Regions:
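Extreme N-terminal starter segment of soluble prokaryotic enzymes
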Residues: 1-4
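Core catalytic region of metal-dependent phosphoesterases/phosphodiesterases
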Residues: 6, 13-118
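Binuclear metal-dependent hydrolase catalytic cores centered on His/Asp/Glu-rich metal-binding motifs
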Residues: 121
């Protein structure tokens, strides 16, 4: 099985577009997203960008329901109150609600975790 590892997103929606193309082209059977969806340098006031990025992640989760999701330090920094570089207090509510929306869009809660095992690896 070929597994596509989607790297840290950090507000870059185009990464999901590229991942989608790779899967559609048959170069991967499934994906694992390393998340780190929020936060990027000098983007703390760009709340719409946060929304757009999470919405793209949610759309990807719906379109590719076997995708596994690994929380990154930037994702958990919001609910855990452990601020990371690039943390946006202005986007906090958005991140928290969109993260919950992403979790609820998955067919199983087991699809999102700190780590995953695929084929005993």
């Amino acid at each position: 099985m070929k597994v596509l590892v989607i790297p840290d997103i950090h507000l870059k929606t185009w990464i999901f577009d590229r991942a989608e193309k790779i899967i559609k082209d048959g170069k991967a059977d499934r994906a694992v997203c390393l998340m780190d969806i929020p936060d990027d340098w000098n983007m703390e006031f760009q709340i719409e960008r946060y929304k757009e990025t999470f919405d793209r992640a949610i759309a990807f989760a719906v379109d590719y329901p076997d995708t596994l999701w690994c929380y990154g330090n930037h994702d958990v920094s919001y609910p855990w109150g452990r601020l990371e570089t690039g943390y946006s207090p202005y986007a906090e509510r958005t991140v928290m609600s969109k993260l919950e929306e992403l979790e609820n869009s998955l067919k199983s809660p087991a699809q999102i975790n700190i780590m995953h095992r695929i084929d005993n690896v």
